[in-house]
């Protein structure tokens, strides 16, 4: 198929079913995420995901890492969403002064796909 530069591909019936668990760690696996602010951090990250128009199913911040379970629309790459979550939440943590030391997330992340049937379990 040949498209000229002015041609636009319109896919009004695009359908996707992408369920992804994203996991990323605090740099050095330091236990910086405290119970005292865990829920507020989770709400903040939830807001980032909602702003990106993705659906959050579950989130849990452990002391040294975070799990996020989302369904992704095809308009965003996993790496872009994760980059935005990590960058914005890192700034949020620093602004709140929740951590006395320099806070940052470890480079990289894990992403694991799930079938629709696994949502119930």
Positions of PLM-derived features:
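Basic nucleic-acid-binding interfaces
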Residues: 1-121
């Amino acid at each position: 198929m040949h498209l000229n530069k002015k041609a636009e591909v319109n896919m009004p019936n695009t359908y996707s079913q992408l369920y992804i668990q994203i996991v990323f760690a605090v740099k050095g696996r330091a236990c910086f995420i405290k119970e005292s602010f865990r829920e507020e951090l989770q709400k903040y990250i939830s807001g980032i995901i909602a702003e990106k128009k993705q659906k959050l199913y579950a989130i849990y911040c452990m002391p040294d890492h975070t799990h996020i379970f989302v369904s992704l629309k095809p308009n965003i790459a996993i790496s872009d969403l994760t980059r935005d979550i990590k960058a914005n939440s890192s700034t949020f943590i620093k602004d709140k002064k929740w951590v006395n030391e320099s806070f940052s997330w470890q480079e990289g992340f894990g992403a694991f796909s799930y079938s629709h049937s696994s949502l119930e379990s």
